[in-house]
């Protein structure tokens, strides 16, 4: 009985979604991969103090992309977005840290690179909204959905970083 209760609580209160354990999903899009920006993007998130807990290079299927961008299905650019995102490999990543969803969105910049400030990823590396280098979850709820779409539980790692005490009080 105790094991059953612990299993239920473990599934209800999953680690990784609040406080310093909050997680977000990022995907370097085909243009970012082709332009060799993956390392620069990882560098920025590591230097900010976030922890990489999952990453893979993959060719996304059209079905997976349609599910990922389901909320945009009525938009005129939807089919083009799916076609573009399946045109080459992407790098899917899960990052963890305090307020990582909100902070990652600020680090990415606006969806339209023309509206992005210098110092943001899109402000520094993009010129066109259709080729804006990177996707990032827009909420904790979206992050949970997107992470479960792109990663299985065994592909995400929990580990203690030796420098974590220098980042979090």
Swiss-Prot record:
SMART domains given for it? NDK
**Cofactor(s) listed in the protein's UniProt record:** Mg(2+)
EC number of this enzyme? 2.7.4.6
Q: What are the catalytic residues? A: 135
Q: What class of enzyme is it?
A: transferase
- Reaction(s) catalyzed by this protein? a 2'-deoxyribonucleoside 5'-diphosphate + ATP = a 2'-deoxyribonucleoside 5'-triphosphate + ADP; a ribonucleoside 5'-diphosphate + ATP = a ribonucleoside 5'-triphosphate + ADP
**Record's subcellular location:** Mitochondrion outer membrane; Cytoplasm; Cytoplasm, Cytoskeleton, Cilium basal body
SUPFAM superfamilies per UniProt: Nucleoside diphosphate kinase, NDK
Q: Which GO terms describe its molecular function?
A: ATP binding; nucleoside diphosphate kinase activity
GO cellular component terms, alphabetically, are:
ciliary basal body; cytoplasm; mitochondrial outer membrane
How does the protein's chain sit in the membrane according to the entry? Answer: Peripheral membrane protein
Is the keyword Transferase assigned to this protein?
Answer: yes
Where ADP is bound, by residue? 29, 105, 111, 122, 129, 132
Question: Per the record, what phenotype accompanies loss of this gene's function?
Answer: Morpholino knockdown of the protein results in cyst formation and left-right asymmetry defects.
Q: Which GO terms describe its biological process?
A: CTP biosynthetic process; determination of left/right symmetry; DNA repair; GTP biosynthetic process; kidney development; mitochondrial fusion; nucleoside triphosphate biosynthetic process; positive regulation of adenylate cyclase-activating G protein-coupled receptor signaling pathway
Give the principal location in a single coarse category: mitochondrion
Q: Which UniProt keywords apply?
A: ATP-binding, Cell projection, Cytoplasm, Cytoskeleton, Kinase, Membrane, Mitochondrion, Mitochondrion outer membrane, Nucleotide-binding, Transferase
* Subunit structure and binding partners: Homohexamer.
The text of the family note is: Belongs to the NDK family.
Swiss-Prot/TrEMBL domain comment? The N-terminal hydrophobic region (1-17) is critical for mitochondrial outer membrane targeting and phosphatidic acid binding.
Q: What's the stated role of this polypeptide?
A: Catalyzes the phosphorylation of ribonucleosides and deoxyribonucleoside diphosphates, other than ATP, into the corresponding triphosphates with ATP as the major phosphate donor. The ATP gamma phosphate is transferred to the nucleoside diphosphate beta phosphate via a ping-pong mechanism, using a phosphorylated active-site intermediate. Through the catalyzed exchange of gamma-phosphate between di- and triphosphonucleosides participates in regulation of intracellular nucleotide homeostasis. Required for ciliary function during renal development.
Annotated protein name in UniProt: Nucleoside diphosphate kinase 3
Q: Which organism is it from?
A: Danio rerio (Zebrafish)
Source taxonomy: Eukaryota, Metazoa, Chordata, Craniata, Vertebrata
Q: Gene encoding this chain?
A: nme3
């Amino acid at each position: 009985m105790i094991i059953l209760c612990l299993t239920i609580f473990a599934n209800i209160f999953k680690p990784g979604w609040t406080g310093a354990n909050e997680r977000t999903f990022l995907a370097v899009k085909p243009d970012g991969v082709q332009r060799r920006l993956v390392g620069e993007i990882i560098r920025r998130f590591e230097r900010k103090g976030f922890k990489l807990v999952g990453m893979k290079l993959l060719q996304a299927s059209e079905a997976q992309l349609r599910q990922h961008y389901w909320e945009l299905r009525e938009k005129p650019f939807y089919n083009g977005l799916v076609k573009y995102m399946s045109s080459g490999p992407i790098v899917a990543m899960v990052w963890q840290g305090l307020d990582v969803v909100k902070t990652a969105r600020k680090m990415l910049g606006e969806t339209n690179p023309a509206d992005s400030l210098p110092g943001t990823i899109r402000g520094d590396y993009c010129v066109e909204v259709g080729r804006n280098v990177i996707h990032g979850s827009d909420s904790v709820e979206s992050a949970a959905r997107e992470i479960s779409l792109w990663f299985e539980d065994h592909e995400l790692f929990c580990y203690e970083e030796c420098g974590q005490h220098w980042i979090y009080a």
